[in-house]
């Protein structure tokens, strides 16, 4: 019995040491990676945090690309789209708080708060409308709210795999599940 207890304690110590070493290695690697990353776009200050705004092209009309939830780096995910459209339009990609090169935020992530931050970021970057809004997935809720609340700022809405407003209600009902998914990733 003593031998089993001693072996179990040794095994547990090994596991804890291994996990600690892995954690330290991971933190060091993250710092090294952070130093090597060169942000694309410009940072503007919105509600005390940095929002990244990427502009490509110099057309007379401006397309604002809004990515859906779960897009880690909107600039990179929509790079081919922005390159193609930038031949004729000014293409702007706003990376919301917590995405891409933007800072995280403790502010509410409801549609009106996100819309307010997007509009402030565009204003801080001296980008004026009216805009052609190209929105993907859950960003459709933001673009619909934008059209409804500020119709003079929206020229056209273009949807890519849009989520319907009822989707947002489902998110509210499943907030605990979403929080668990966030922390487990």
Task: Report the location of each language-model feature.
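Alpha/beta-hydrolase fold catalytic core
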Residues: 2-63, 87-89
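Conserved HGGG/HGGXW glycine-rich cap/lid loop of the alpha/beta-hydrolase fold
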Residues: 49-101
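Aromatic pocket-lining residues of Rossmann-like dinucleotide-binding sites
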Residues: 85, 146-147
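Active-site loop/oxyanion-hole signature of alpha/beta-hydrolase fold enzymes
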Residues: 96-132
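Flexible "cap/lid" subdomain of the alpha/beta-hydrolase fold that forms the substrate-access gate
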Residues: 111, 150-185
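Short beta-strand immediately N-terminal to the catalytic nucleophile in serine-hydrolase-like folds
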Residues: 133-135, 160
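Gly/Ala-rich beta-loop-alpha elbow adjacent to hydrolase catalytic centers
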Residues: 135-139, 143
């Amino acid at each position: 019995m003593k031998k089993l207890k001693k072996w179990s304690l040794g095994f547990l110590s090994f596991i804890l040491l291994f996990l600690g070493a892995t954690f330290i290695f991971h933190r060091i690697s993250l710092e090294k990676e952070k130093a090597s990353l060169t942000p694309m776009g410009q940072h503007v200050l919105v509600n005390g945090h940095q929002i990244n705004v990427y502009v490509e092209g110099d057309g007379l009309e401006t397309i604002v690309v809004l990515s859906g939830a779960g897009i880690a780096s909107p600039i990179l995910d929509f790079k081919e789209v922005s390159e193609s459209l930038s031949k004729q339009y000014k293409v702007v990609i706003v990376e919301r708080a917590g995405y891409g090169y933007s800072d995280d935020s403790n502010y509410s992530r409801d549609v009106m708060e996100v819309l307010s931050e997007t509009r402030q970021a565009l204003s801080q970057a001296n980008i004026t409308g009216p805009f052609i809004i190209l929105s993907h997935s859950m960003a459709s809720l933001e673009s619909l709210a934008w059209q409804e609340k500020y119709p003079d700022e929206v020229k056209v809405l273009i949807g890519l795999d849009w989520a319907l407003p009822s989707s947002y209600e489902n998110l509210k009902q499943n907030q605990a599940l979403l929080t668990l998914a966030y922390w487990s990733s």
